[in-house]
Amino acid sequence: MVMIMELLYAITAFILGMLHALEPGHGKSVVAAYILGTKADLKDAILLGTTITISHTAVIFLLGILSIYLLESLNVDVVHDMMSVVGGLILIAVGIWIIRSYLHPHEHKVDTKKGVITLGLSAGLVPCPAALAVLLLSISSGNLIDGLIYVAIFSIGLAISLTGLAVAFVESKELIKKYVGNRKVSKLPLISGSIIILIGLYTIAHPILEHAIV
């Protein structure tokens, strides 16, 4: 019976991870804006989905570990907000980099892979409240290992879903060119860079506004 329940929890964590990538939020927007606005290919799409997931999972694990050893002296919510601000700043930097590359295409060669890794790490710095809640609940009940396992399974589901979306965006490029036209498509880097900057600003402003309202 216990094994059946654990299996159900694992399946639920996996499904929730997949669904999390489809929930309203900046994850999909960042992936779409970057891939459609740069020369990212299938390898870049897979790398982006994987990097976001690794960064996402590492941050949750870090917050969980910090909550164990520094529970009395550390406010996990404050660390969460700090991660959001740092992630937002990096997103803004990536957005500026995309726009700069568009405006000055001959000044330097665009390193797509470097941009993918930077973007993936920054987007993953904003922890998922649901996954963090599962880990903290497991810690409070003395089941740290179970919590880490469920978060890892959640992250696998997230990785599959995010990577699938990224690949879909790559494959849709040619379709967009066909129906929109190359002239308009050439403006995509300017649009995508602006969107990523706005998302970065929102990521920074969100925790600040929450504290201001409270």
From Swiss-Prot:
Keyword terms of this UniProt record: Cell membrane, Cobalt, Cobalt transport, Ion transport, Membrane, Nickel, Nickel transport, Transmembrane, Transmembrane helix, Transport
GO molecular function annotation: nickel cation transmembrane transporter activity
GO biological process: cobalt ion transport; response to cobalt ion; response to nickel cation
Topology in membrane: Multi-pass membrane protein
Gene Ontology, cellular component aspect: plasma membrane
Keyword Transport: yes
Subcellular location: Cell membrane
Membrane spanning residue stretches: 2-22, 46-66, 79-99, 116-136, 149-169, 188-208
A Pfam family recorded for this sequence: DsbD_2
PANTHER family: NICKEL/COBALT EFFLUX SYSTEM RCNA, NICKEL_COBALT EFFLUX SYSTEM RCNA
Family per similarity comment: Belongs to the NiCoT transporter (TC 2.A.52) family.
Job of this protein: Efflux system for nickel and cobalt.
Protein's recorded name: Putative nickel/cobalt efflux system MJ1092
